[in-house]
Curated annotation (Swiss-Prot):
Annotated keywords: Developmental protein, DNA-binding, Homeobox, Nucleus
Biased composition (Basic and acidic residues): 241-257
Lineage, uppermost ranks: Eukaryota, Metazoa, Chordata, Craniata, Vertebrata
Gene that encodes the chain: GSC
Family to which the UniProt record says this protein belongs: Belongs to the paired homeobox family. Bicoid subfamily.
DNA-binding stretch(es), residue numbering of this chain: 160-219
SMART domains per the UniProt record, alphabetical: HOX
GO molecular function: DNA-binding transcription factor activity, RNA polymerase II-specific; RNA polymerase II cis-regulatory region sequence-specific DNA binding
Gene Ontology cellular component terms for the protein in this record: nucleus
Compartment(s) of residence: Nucleus
Record-given protein name: Homeobox protein goosecoid
Span list, region Disordered: 213-257
Amino acid sequence: MPASMFSIDNILAARPRCKDSVLPVAPSAAAPVVFPALHGDSLYGASGGASSDYGAFYPRPVAPGGAGLQAAVGGSRLGYNNYFYGQLHVQAAPVGPACCGAVPPLGAQQCSCVPTPPGYEGPGSVLVSPVPHQMLPYMNVGTLSRTELQLLNQLHCRRKRRHRTIFTDEQLEALENLFQETKYPDVGTREQLARKVHLREEKVEVWFKNRRAKWRRQKRSSSEESENAEKWNKTSSSKASPEKREEEGKSDLDSDS
């Protein structure tokens, strides 16, 4: 085996160079942003001429070539300049080899409450959903770090809006009448009332829990008001002037005589 194969130049030449191995990326290229399908309407306005909810506030994006990008990709729409609204996937940037010390691609940050658009379930994407439209002019996906994207997704998964039941007047009247009879109805009574007012027994149970909490708050506030009134009467009587006390004493003597 020739000794030239073990020279410094040959050994260094066999190692991959970072500048040559990193995928080329244009300076102006940004991470693509994918919008969900909007049921026939684009993000910035309806195709039929009628403007959408936000069509009057946000102008249509214009591509560098002069044509707006409205084509659907994998059932989703793309937006320019990294500005986004709603559910989207941010594709991870190309990563170099291990010799460059590059950060490995971020795995898909998904949760059960956020659906994943088809075709973008790969490990090189980050799911961020949703973002309020008030933040649209100020949010830039390209400037967000990996930790910020994870926090956005965790915030959405943690805060899940509950469905609020709206009771009718007849239902509220029946519930209130039973509450005046008993504060803690049993399961049979709750089921009977639920069938009567066309509600689920769980809804009746939750209503009674909230009503008892309200009743305790009202009871506590009324007791505090009565205590404050008694304290005020005591302090006002103790601060009476001596002249007033003498007049009251004279009036008592005159009444006795």
